[in-house]
């Protein structure tokens, strides 16, 4: 059943949002973002005080996704304009410059309850650029805060957002190109290439609740961050993550987790996945698992590196009480660290258990294959060095 919604500029969030027509208000009387199934909004080139045009545009929404919709948004001074086009189940967004996002992102997807699902399918999002202009606000290309966001066969390419200078705190600024903050996230058959953001070059998951992340049959190539998580950043002790049949290659981070940063995340499962030629400045050329339990099966780490003079764990860095990494099958080949643990570094109470794993040609100043420091239980079964 179709429902009618209205495009409204939310001045406090600095973004266009789609709201239930009955509850909407463009006079700032507390617009409520209630959407039966899917909400899409975008703003281009708008500062925090600029007002967008065409706030009365009506769109139709079905139970699963927006259909046959074109919405144009312009700044007061016509610095830039942008276009959302959703044709059937196909989404195409490209060549957009956003000069000043606040809390909201370019595409703000909201479900009316935790049971609802928002789906992006069969499309591309490319060449977005911009920056967040306010401390502690976290714009992204796509933001989801409730329900479940599904991304199916979508390409995100060359979307780049500037870092906000807020002292030494790495957690301010643009969090991922995809940001799930309190929402479940499912990514399937999708590609993330050449994206840049502050925490998580492609995906950021940040939750205080029981949420799930599922990434399957997807590719992450050449994504980057100056901070943590070159491709993916996940935090939240109750967030359960599953990664399967994925490829992470040539992603980079200035600090930790060249491909994947797990920062106090919940239980994480990685299966039939390859990490190759990823690089981090300090900890975990491919994966940094801090305070996180990871169970891996048939995972390959090849040619990853912790590149700085203080580089630890060319492929994998596992840290902290309660943290653990187990792997059955797979290999660590040609990984390197400038300092400790050419393939793996385990420290400060973290556990490591490997079975049927092969190490070959890994290098470091100390511990060419594995280096430990005040680690918990470390076991190797049928493992080749």
Label each residue range with its predicted role.
Residues 5-7, 54, 59, 111, ...:
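Assembly/interface hotspot detector across virion components, adhesins/toxins, and nucleic-acid enzymes
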């Amino acid at each position: 059943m179709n429902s009618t919604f209205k495009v409204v500029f939310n001045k406090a969030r600095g973004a266009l949002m789609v709201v239930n027509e009955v509850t909407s208000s463009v006079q700032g009387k507390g617009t409520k973002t209630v959407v039966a199934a899917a909400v899409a909004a975008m703003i281009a080139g708008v500062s925090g005080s600029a007002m967008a045009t065409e706030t009365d545009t009506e769109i139709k929404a079905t139970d699963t996704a927006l259909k046959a919709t074109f919405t144009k948004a312009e700044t007061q001074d016509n610095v830039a304009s942008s276009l959302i086009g959703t044709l059937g189940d196909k989404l195409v967004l490209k060549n957009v410059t956003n000069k000043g996002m606040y809390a909201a992102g370019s595409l703000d997807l909201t479900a009316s309850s935790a049971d609802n699902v928002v789906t992006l399918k069969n499309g591309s999002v490319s060449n977005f650029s911009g920056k967040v202009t306010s401390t502690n606000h976290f714009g992204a290309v796509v933001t989801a805060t409730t329900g479940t966001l599904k991304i199916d066969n979508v390409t995100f390419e060359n979307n780049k957002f500037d870092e906000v200078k807020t002292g030494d705190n790495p957690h301010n600024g643009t969090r991922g190109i995809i940001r799930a903050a309190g929402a479940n996230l499912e990514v399937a058959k999708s590609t993330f290439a050449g994206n840049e953001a502050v925490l998580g070059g492609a995906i950021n998951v940040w939750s205080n609740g029981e949420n799930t992340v599922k990434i399957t049959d997807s590719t992450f190539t050449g994504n980057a961050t100056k901070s943590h998580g070159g491709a993916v950043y996940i935090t939240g002790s109750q967030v359960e993550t599953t990664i399967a049949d994925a490829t992470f290659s040539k992603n980079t981070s200035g600090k930790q987790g060249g491909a994947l940063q797990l920062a106090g995340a919940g239980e994480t499962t990685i299966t039939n996945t390859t990490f190759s030629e990823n690089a981090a400045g300090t900890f975990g050329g491919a994966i940094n698992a801090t305070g996180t339990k990871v169970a891996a099966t048939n995972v390959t780490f090849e040619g990853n590196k912790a590149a700085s003079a203080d580089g630890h764990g060319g492929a994998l860095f596992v840290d902290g009480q309660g943290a653990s990494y187990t792997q059955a099958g797979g290999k660590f080949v040609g990984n390197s660290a400038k300092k400790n643990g050419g393939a793996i570094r385990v420290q400060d109470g973290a556990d490591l258990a490997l079975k049927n794993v092969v190490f070959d040609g890994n290098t470091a100043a100390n511990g060419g294959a594995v280096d430990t420091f005040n680690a918990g239980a470390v076991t190797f079964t049928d493992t080749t060095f």
